[in-house]
Amino acid sequence: MIKAIIGLGNPGEKYKNTRHNVGFMVADLVAKSLNCDRKYREKAFSHIFECPDYDVIIAKPQTYMNLSGNAVLNILKDYKIKPSEILVVYDDLDLPLGAVRLRLKGSSGGHNGIKSIINTIKTEEFPRLKIGIGRPEKKEEVSDYVLSPFTKEEKFLLDKVLAHANECILNVLKYGIEKSMNMCNKNLV
Protein backbone atom coordinates (compact mmCIF):
# COMPACT_ATOMS: atom_id res chain seq x y z
CA MET A 1 0.00 0.00 0.00
CA ILE A 2 1.36 3.39 -1.00
CA LYS A 3 1.56 5.85 1.91
CA ALA A 4 3.58 8.65 0.29
CA ILE A 5 3.68 10.07 -3.22
CA ILE A 6 6.94 11.94 -3.68
CA GLY A 7 7.24 14.21 -6.70
CA LEU A 8 10.82 15.16 -7.55
CA GLY A 9 11.86 18.59 -8.76
CA ASN A 10 13.84 21.68 -7.89
CA PRO A 11 12.46 24.30 -5.49
CA GLY A 12 11.91 27.90 -6.50
CA GLU A 13 10.05 29.91 -9.09
CA LYS A 14 13.00 29.71 -11.50
CA TYR A 15 12.46 25.96 -12.01
CA LYS A 16 8.68 25.79 -11.68
CA ASN A 17 7.81 24.99 -15.31
CA THR A 18 10.93 23.09 -16.34
CA ARG A 19 11.14 19.52 -17.61
CA HIS A 20 12.98 18.45 -14.45
CA ASN A 21 9.95 19.51 -12.39
CA VAL A 22 7.29 17.23 -13.86
CA GLY A 23 7.36 15.31 -10.57
CA PHE A 24 6.28 18.47 -8.75
CA MET A 25 3.61 19.13 -11.40
CA VAL A 26 2.13 15.65 -10.93
CA ALA A 27 2.30 15.96 -7.12
CA ASP A 28 0.34 19.23 -7.26
CA LEU A 29 -2.30 17.68 -9.52
CA VAL A 30 -2.69 14.59 -7.31
CA ALA A 31 -2.93 16.74 -4.16
CA LYS A 32 -5.74 18.69 -5.81
CA SER A 33 -7.51 15.52 -7.03
CA LEU A 34 -7.37 13.95 -3.56
CA ASN A 35 -8.61 17.16 -1.96
CA CYS A 36 -5.54 17.28 0.27
CA ASP A 37 -4.97 20.14 2.66
CA ARG A 38 -4.27 23.25 0.59
CA LYS A 39 -1.61 24.44 2.97
CA TYR A 40 1.54 22.42 2.96
CA ARG A 41 3.64 21.74 6.03
CA GLU A 42 7.40 22.11 6.10
CA LYS A 43 8.64 18.75 7.33
CA ALA A 44 11.45 16.37 6.38
CA PHE A 45 13.04 18.99 4.08
CA SER A 46 9.83 18.89 2.03
CA HIS A 47 6.51 20.53 1.38
CA ILE A 48 4.05 17.94 2.71
CA PHE A 49 0.37 17.90 1.76
CA GLU A 50 -1.72 15.72 4.06
CA CYS A 51 -4.73 13.97 2.56
CA PRO A 52 -7.10 13.09 5.42
CA ASP A 53 -9.63 11.26 3.20
CA TYR A 54 -6.86 8.95 2.00
CA ASP A 55 -4.12 7.45 4.12
CA VAL A 56 -1.42 9.13 2.04
CA ILE A 57 0.81 12.19 2.00
CA ILE A 58 2.06 14.07 -1.04
CA ALA A 59 5.64 15.34 -0.73
CA LYS A 60 7.72 17.76 -2.78
CA PRO A 61 11.33 17.66 -1.53
CA GLN A 62 12.89 21.11 -1.27
CA THR A 63 16.50 19.91 -1.34
CA TYR A 64 17.18 20.29 -5.08
CA MET A 65 17.10 17.25 -7.30
CA ASN A 66 20.60 15.91 -6.66
CA LEU A 67 19.98 15.77 -2.89
CA SER A 68 16.49 14.22 -3.01
CA GLY A 69 17.66 11.24 -0.97
CA ASN A 70 18.04 13.39 2.16
CA ALA A 71 14.39 14.43 2.01
CA VAL A 72 13.14 10.93 1.17
CA LEU A 73 15.08 9.40 4.07
CA ASN A 74 13.54 11.95 6.45
CA ILE A 75 10.05 11.26 5.06
CA LEU A 76 10.56 7.53 5.66
CA LYS A 77 11.72 8.17 9.24
CA ASP A 78 9.25 10.90 10.21
CA TYR A 79 6.21 9.05 8.86
CA LYS A 80 7.44 5.52 9.68
CA ILE A 81 7.11 4.44 6.05
CA LYS A 82 9.01 1.62 4.29
CA PRO A 83 10.64 2.22 0.88
CA SER A 84 8.09 -0.15 -0.68
CA GLU A 85 5.32 2.21 0.51
CA ILE A 86 6.46 5.28 -1.45
CA LEU A 87 5.81 6.17 -5.08
CA VAL A 88 8.46 8.48 -6.51
CA VAL A 89 7.39 10.52 -9.56
CA TYR A 90 10.09 11.99 -11.79
CA ASP A 91 11.19 12.97 -15.30
CA ASP A 92 12.89 10.44 -17.57
CA LEU A 93 15.11 11.46 -20.50
CA ASP A 94 15.03 7.95 -21.97
CA LEU A 95 11.28 8.01 -22.51
CA PRO A 96 9.73 10.28 -25.14
CA LEU A 97 7.36 13.04 -24.08
CA GLY A 98 4.01 11.30 -23.85
CA ALA A 99 5.31 8.08 -22.28
CA VAL A 100 4.51 7.10 -18.70
CA ARG A 101 5.99 4.04 -16.98
CA LEU A 102 5.09 2.57 -13.61
CA ARG A 103 7.75 0.32 -12.07
CA LEU A 104 8.02 -1.59 -8.78
CA LYS A 105 11.79 -1.07 -8.54
CA GLY A 106 14.89 -0.49 -10.63
CA SER A 107 18.17 1.32 -11.08
CA SER A 108 18.61 5.08 -11.30
CA GLY A 109 18.84 5.00 -15.08
CA GLY A 110 21.28 7.90 -14.74
CA HIS A 111 18.75 10.17 -13.01
CA ASN A 112 20.59 12.06 -10.27
CA GLY A 113 17.54 12.44 -8.02
CA ILE A 114 16.87 8.69 -8.10
CA LYS A 115 20.58 8.00 -7.69
CA SER A 116 20.56 10.17 -4.54
CA ILE A 117 17.54 8.31 -3.15
CA ILE A 118 19.07 4.88 -3.84
CA ASN A 119 22.41 5.88 -2.28
CA THR A 120 20.75 7.42 0.79
CA ILE A 121 18.09 4.83 1.62
CA LYS A 122 20.35 1.96 0.49
CA THR A 123 17.86 0.20 -1.78
CA GLU A 124 16.49 0.23 -5.34
CA GLU A 125 13.34 -1.49 -4.07
CA PHE A 126 10.85 1.37 -4.20
CA PRO A 127 8.05 2.02 -6.71
CA ARG A 128 8.36 4.84 -9.19
CA LEU A 129 6.39 6.56 -11.92
CA LYS A 130 8.57 7.79 -14.77
CA ILE A 131 7.32 10.64 -16.93
CA GLY A 132 8.99 10.86 -20.34
CA ILE A 133 10.51 14.19 -21.32
CA GLY A 134 12.62 12.96 -24.26
CA ARG A 135 16.19 13.93 -25.05
CA PRO A 136 17.44 17.19 -26.52
CA GLU A 137 17.39 17.07 -30.33
CA LYS A 138 20.32 19.32 -31.00
CA LYS A 139 23.70 19.44 -29.33
CA GLU A 140 22.08 21.03 -26.29
CA GLU A 141 23.58 19.99 -22.97
CA VAL A 142 21.34 17.62 -21.02
CA SER A 143 21.52 19.88 -17.93
CA ASP A 144 20.33 22.88 -19.98
CA TYR A 145 17.57 20.80 -21.53
CA VAL A 146 16.10 19.43 -18.28
CA LEU A 147 16.21 22.90 -16.71
CA SER A 148 14.42 24.54 -19.64
CA PRO A 149 10.66 25.03 -19.91
CA PHE A 150 8.47 22.99 -22.23
CA THR A 151 7.77 24.53 -25.64
CA LYS A 152 4.29 25.69 -26.59
CA GLU A 153 3.80 22.57 -28.71
CA GLU A 154 5.00 20.30 -25.89
CA LYS A 155 2.66 21.92 -23.35
CA PHE A 156 -0.38 20.62 -25.23
CA LEU A 157 0.87 17.04 -24.87
CA LEU A 158 2.17 17.70 -21.35
CA ASP A 159 -1.36 18.46 -20.13
CA LYS A 160 -2.49 15.03 -21.35
CA VAL A 161 0.55 13.36 -19.77
CA LEU A 162 -0.05 15.04 -16.41
CA ALA A 163 -3.73 14.04 -16.47
CA HIS A 164 -2.77 10.45 -17.31
CA ALA A 165 -0.14 10.36 -14.53
CA ASN A 166 -2.76 11.66 -12.10
CA GLU A 167 -5.23 8.93 -13.15
CA CYS A 168 -2.47 6.36 -12.85
CA ILE A 169 -1.68 7.39 -9.27
CA LEU A 170 -5.37 7.37 -8.31
CA ASN A 171 -5.54 3.80 -9.68
CA VAL A 172 -2.43 2.82 -7.73
CA LEU A 173 -4.00 4.12 -4.52
CA LYS A 174 -7.20 2.20 -5.22
CA TYR A 175 -5.92 -1.07 -6.74
CA GLY A 176 -2.19 -1.26 -5.99
CA ILE A 177 0.80 -1.03 -8.29
CA GLU A 178 0.74 -4.40 -10.02
CA LYS A 179 -2.94 -4.14 -10.97
CA SER A 180 -2.41 -0.58 -12.24
CA MET A 181 0.55 -1.26 -14.55
CA ASN A 182 -1.46 -2.03 -17.70
CA MET A 183 -3.49 1.13 -17.33
CA CYS A 184 -0.49 3.29 -16.47
CA ASN A 185 2.18 2.13 -18.91
CA LYS A 186 1.24 4.02 -22.07
CA ASN A 187 2.60 6.19 -24.81
CA LEU A 188 0.13 9.00 -25.40
CA VAL A 189 1.49 9.84 -28.87
UniProtKB/Swiss-Prot annotation:
The active site is at residue 20. The record marks 10 as: Discriminates between blocked and unblocked aminoacyl-tRNA. One of its GO terms (biological process) is protein quality control for misfolded or incompletely synthesized proteins. Keywords: Cytoplasm, Hydrolase, RNA-binding, tRNA-binding. The record marks 91 as: Stabilizes the basic form of H active site to accept a proton. The keyword tRNA-binding applies. This is Peptidyl-tRNA hydrolase. It comes from Sulfurihydrogenibium sp. (strain YO3AOP1). The lineage of its organism: Bacteria, Pseudomonadati, Aquificota, Aquificia, Aquificales. The gene is pth.
